[in-house]
Amino acid sequence: MQDQNNSNTPKKKKLSFWGIIGIVASILVLLVIAYIIYYYVSQTTVLKRDFSFLNRAIQEAAKSATDDIYFKSIVDNPYNNSLVATMQLPENVWAALNGMTSTSTRIRVVTFEVHATTSMKNILYNEIISSIGGATPSFSRGLAMILGYSENGVTKAGEFLSTGAPTESIWSTVLRYGTNIIFLLLFAASFIFMFMSFRSQRGTGGLLDNKSVAQRIYSNKKFSDIAGNEEVKEEVKELVDYLKNPKKYSTAGARIPKGILLGGPPGTGKTLIAKATAGEANVPFFFISASNFVEMFVGLGAKRVRDMFEEARKTAPAIIFIDELDAVGRSRGAGIGGGNDEREQTLNQLLVEMDGIKENSGILIMAATNRSDVLDPALLRPGRFDRTITVGLPDIKEREAILKLHAKGKRIANNVSFMMIARRTPGFSGAQLENVINEASLLSVRENTNVITLPQLDEAIDRVMAGPAKKSRTISEKENAAVAYHEAGHAVVGIKIKGGNKVQKITIIPRGHAGGYNLMMPEEEKYNRSKAELIAIITSFMGGRVAEAIIYGKDNVSTGASDDIAKATRIARKMVTEWGLSELGPIKYEEDTDNPFLGRDYMKNASFSAQVGQEIDQEIRKIILAAEANAHKIISENRELLELIKDALIINETIVAEEIEYIAKNMKLPPAITKTKEDLHEEYSDQDFDNLFNEVSGKKIISEDKYVDDLNKEIKQLEEKIEANKSSSKSTVNEEKSKDEKNN
């Protein structure tokens, strides 16, 4: 019973170091406040006067035949060169001494202080002494000094005093030494804080202890929580099975991989796979970010690596997961700060622990990185990271599975097709797809709908890709029409050209830095593309610029095509320099990796001469100009389709693939858009309405083509220039060959 009572008794909390510091600081603050209050309360108000004022006052006292003007005391303070006089006198005399007038004879007592140096005091004393016949009284006979100055023999002085050496009050002592004490306490607190923080770096693994900085976590994730990445899951499942049943593999004489490296773009689920591994394996799982190894102190990173592996060996079988491995695993000797820095020392220790003298049986090392290309080769060799698995972006079926997984527990409208959403999200990572579902859920709550609708999912896709719509931006009808023509040009080329990107959605609502937004996707996902398909894609990109040139002329083309030009140029350059799809032949002039997260070279390998560089530029220009000419031909032959899609954008601001297909098939606006157009007619006059939609009495007017079609001429000139360069190169080679023959 006693034990029970004791167990229920609340334990007294020990006073921490910071609690003591807080109490001491509070006491010091209270003392300072008390001193300030005491100082101001104890201060007496003393009038300040000059030395001549004191002389006049003494003379007035000497001239008076009565005791109405009387010095109660004069205090000499030699330590601050002052005289403090206290006297009684009538109001009118006090006023006269201060240069004022008064008729009152009421007696008052005043105290005033005058500044007087030693020489000034001596003058005053000498005058007083001379007035009593030259006799020099002792200091204790100070009464006679003023008494002798009286002409009528009337007593005019009380005491003449001299202050002793000043004594320091307790408050002055506290104020003088308190600042030093506070400074010392703050210094000690800072030192102890640094010491304690280093001992408990991020909770564990400090300077002086042997605790590992790696966190031992318990995950509730399973492989069933991961959609897609089936091949990766199969690889990891094998490792988990080994940790659960090691005898099965040892009997077969198999050595399980010591390490597995997960690489790939961000958001593809590398860390999620590690969490699922921890949840499935049911063994100790140690998680650490590679950036936690390197700190400001030399040797701390290597120590943390040793501590982490030592703790894992004690609990084997175990899994160690290092996230963002490139923070510590970059190739040695490539740093600007020199080869023997703290990061490289940490990497060396990691290499030793993974495959060194000590055995790591029963320990599986997993790591994730977005930059596997920059890792040290010694880290990637067999025996350390035996397997390198690329966790890539999901394909259309995997995107559908990921969307369904994240949609569990959410109310989705019946007409929503996840396959259609997956088709509209090419290149999306798993994290982006999860964000799409979450954004749609937030829109559903904002719009107060019971279920997540298809328009909300479409808007969520747009928000993830290009940011929220800027609906409040004021755009003139003229600029709005120009944007509509631009986006309609992309759509027309995409519809009519074979192998090009098809438009899935168009909007003229500004998003991000763009005035409009066009979702263009290939008809089907492919890993390889032919030259014709690439040229068709470039032609689709040029459709917007060409449409503007046809309607407004080449001199009035806007800057809205900058992104299209950049994409088209990038594809054309790769066709010439990497893929061998030009007249220069199958030669690789430059090296650039499609996926920057699997290898990005900021300084491209350009191993060619200036003349070859000129030929490359000419080939790129030739491809772009040919695509632009083809886009002009397609749009010129489909001007009415261009106008209809432009009208649909002006009316609805956003149209999707189904509406675009309806317009292309029936050469008229869908019924819903037609009705909106009729309602819109009521807001405009007939003339303004016709000008907006290029109509007269409901019939389309196809304006004059303002595009200057000199592209074919430019292409011909380019071809002639290329041929001239080839002839020049051939003659140069022949001359060098003949010289060599002569020399031989």
UniProtKB/Swiss-Prot annotation:
Zn(2+) binds at H486, H490, D564. ATP binds at G264, P265, P266, G267, T268, G269, K270, T271. Its cofactor is Zn(2+). Residues 1-16, 199-744 are cytoplasmic. The chain crosses the membrane at residues 17-37, 178-198. It is a multi-pass membrane protein. Residues 38-177 are extracellular. It is found in: Cell membrane. Binds 1 zinc ion per subunit. Keywords: ATP-binding, Cell membrane, Hydrolase, Membrane, Metal-binding, Metalloprotease, Nucleotide-binding, Protease, Transmembrane, Transmembrane helix, Zinc. Its EC number is 3.4.24.-. It holds the Pfam family AAA. Residues 722-744 are annotated as: Disordered. InterPro entries: AAA+_ATPase, AAA_lid_3, ATPase_AAA_core, ATPase_AAA_CS, FtsH, P-loop_NTPase, Peptidase_M41, Peptidase_M41-like. GO terms for biological process: protein catabolic process; proteolysis. SUPFAM superfamilies: FtsH protease domain-like, P-loop containing nucleoside triphosphate hydrolases. The active site is at E487. Homohexamer. Acts as a processive, ATP-dependent zinc metallopeptidase for both cytoplasmic and membrane proteins. Plays a role in the quality control of integral membrane proteins. In the central section; belongs to the AAA ATPase family. This is ATP-dependent zinc metalloprotease FtsH. The gene is ftsH.
